[in-house]
């Protein structure tokens, strides 16, 4: 087990008095295994205390209609330009294969049944998060914006997504898994094709896979600053290789959401 280190700050008038070190030592007593996704400033401090960092997991973004990111052009409602952009992007991902699309609220049982028999990672080179059906229900069915959560299914591969509007129409891919052979890249391609046809402006995901470069341009990739510490040298060696997390495991998706 481990605890998630969020952050801490020292007020300006108390800086230089060693309080940060004292706070950290007290925090370390809570649990011998600690992890964090942190800012550059926090990482700089944590590394002084022996934390290891890893940048394998990336925040992935694919703009479909860049015009909607420019307020002036967005207000002009350039429908022709929008259709043209989607047409050229669609040529790369066009497919006649249908992908099943469900609203989570009315179809949770389908997702829950597949989640129960999903294939779990057998890679012992990096740490993973233990997820079960109770976690799935809590994360999705008790989510304040569950009305905006959906999932796709393709060849027994599933993708839980969050579709909402904040300045632009977004599709956040929260979590993917399979119950049989993995077709993750194909799943992402079909989701991209669906997004183009349904007026989505931007795709977003968090993933450590290097097999999605045909979908997410490298220029928009942003490595997550993962850091970890453990009093056990063997555990720290594993944590040094990073954590297998996806968008559903962070608060980034929730921070983007506006009710």
Regions found by a protein language model. Give the residues of each.
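Short glycine/proline-enriched coil/turn segments at helix->beta-strand junctions
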Residues: 28-33, 155-156
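Residues forming well-ordered secondary-structure scaffolds
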Residues: 3, 18-22, 37-41
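Conserved acetyl-CoA-binding loop-helix of GNAT-fold acetyltransferases
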Residues: 10-30, 181-194
């Amino acid at each position: 087990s481990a605890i998630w280190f969020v952050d801490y700050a020292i007020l300006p008038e108390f800086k230089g008095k060693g309080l940060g070190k004292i706070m950290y030592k007290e925090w370390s007593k809570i649990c011998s295994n600690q992890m964090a996704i942190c800012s550059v400033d926090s990482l700089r401090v944590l590394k002084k205390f022996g934390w290891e960092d890893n940048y394998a997991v990336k925040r992935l973004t694919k703009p479909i209609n860049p015009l909607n990111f420019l307020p002036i052009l967005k207000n002009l409602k350039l429908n022709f330009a929008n259709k043209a952009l989607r047409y050229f992007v669609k040529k790369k991902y066009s497919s006649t294969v249908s992908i099943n699309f469900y609203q989570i609220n009315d179809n949770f049982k389908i997702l829950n049944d597949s989640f129960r028999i999903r294939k779990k990672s057998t890679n012992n080179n990096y740490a993973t998060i233990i997820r079960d059906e109770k976690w799935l229900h809590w994360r999705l069915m008790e989510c304040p914006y569950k009305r905006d959560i959906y999932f796709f299914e393709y060849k027994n591969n599933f993708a839980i997504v969050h579709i909402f509007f904040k300045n632009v129409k977004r599709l956040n891919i929260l979590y993917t898994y399979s119950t049989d052979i993995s077709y993750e890249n194909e799943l992402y391609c079909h989701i991209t094709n669906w997004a183009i046809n349904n007026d989505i402006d931007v795709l977003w995901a968090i993933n450590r896979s290097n097999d999605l470069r045909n979908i997410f341009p490298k220029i928009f990739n942003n490595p997550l600053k993962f850091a970890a510490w453990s009093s056990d040298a063997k555990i720290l060696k594993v944590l040094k290789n990073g954590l297998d997390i996806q968008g559903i495991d962070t608060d980034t998706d929730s921070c983007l959401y506006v009710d």
